[in-house]
A protein has these predicted regions:
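Short, flexible helix/strand-to-coil boundary loops that buttress conserved ligand/catalytic motifs
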Residues: 26, 34, 46, 54, ...
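NTP-dependent small-molecule kinase module
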Residues: 6, 10, 56, 82, ...
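Structural signal for short hydrophobic segments within the conserved structured cores
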Residues: 14-16, 102, 127-129
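Short glycine-rich anion-binding loops that position phosphate/pyrophosphate groups of nucleotides
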Residues: 64-67, 89-91, 134
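A glycine- and Lys/Arg-enriched "phosphate-lid" helix/loop adjacent to the NTP-binding pocket
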Residues: 80-119
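Short acidic active-site motifs
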Residues: 45-49, 72-73, 109, 116-117, ...
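Walker A/P-loop
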Residues: 1
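ATP-dependent small-molecule kinase phosphotransfer cores
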Residues: 14, 18-78
């Protein structure tokens, strides 16, 4: 989300965090949805709101890490956009605050999810960008790479 925001600032394209968009539309936080309705219900909502966002032109969308679990989500995003995977080490990911991410509450689960998803991220990405530097450098990498794709 942070990189998406920075990219938006540098390119003047509007930025949408898909998880925040979902929370605003549902008037609840994701952890409550998981706790009360479960992951499958959340994933269906995620798809619904990704469809809504992807109908817009010229925007930047940041998705949650699990969006890749449903191929339909990837197909939706690729219809009008370019899917960028920000490649980070699991060590870097583990240092973040994950209090609002129900599936990332312990390190064992983080490793499990990483192992489940990493190949999907790489498979579905149109572009893979190393996210191993400060925001300014990473956003410049994205912009430089996109210039060759647009």
């Amino acid at each position: 989300s942070t990189i998406g925001y920075w990219l938006s600032q540098k390119t003047n394209y509007p930025f949408f965090d898909a998880d925040k968009h979902l929370e605003e539309k549902e008037n609840r936080i994701i952890s409550d949805i998981f706790a009360n309705e479960g992951e499958e219900y959340f994933r269906d909502l995620e798809t619904k709101y990704l469809k809504e966002l992807s109908e817009r032109q010229g925007i930047i969308i940041s998705t949650g890490g699990g969006a890749v679990k449903k191929k339909e989500n990837i197909d939706i995003l690729k219809q009008n956009g370019i899917v960028i995977f920000l490649d980070r080490t699991i060590e870097d990911i583990s240092r973040e605050n994950h209090e609002n991410r129900p599936l990332l509450q312990n390190i064992e689960n983080l490793w499990k999810l990483y192992d489940e998803r990493i190949n999907l991220y790489r498979k579905y990405a149109d572009i893979i960008i190393k996210n191993d530097d400060d925001m300014d450098v990473v956003t410049d990498r994205i912009i430089t790479t996109l210039k060759g794709k647009l």
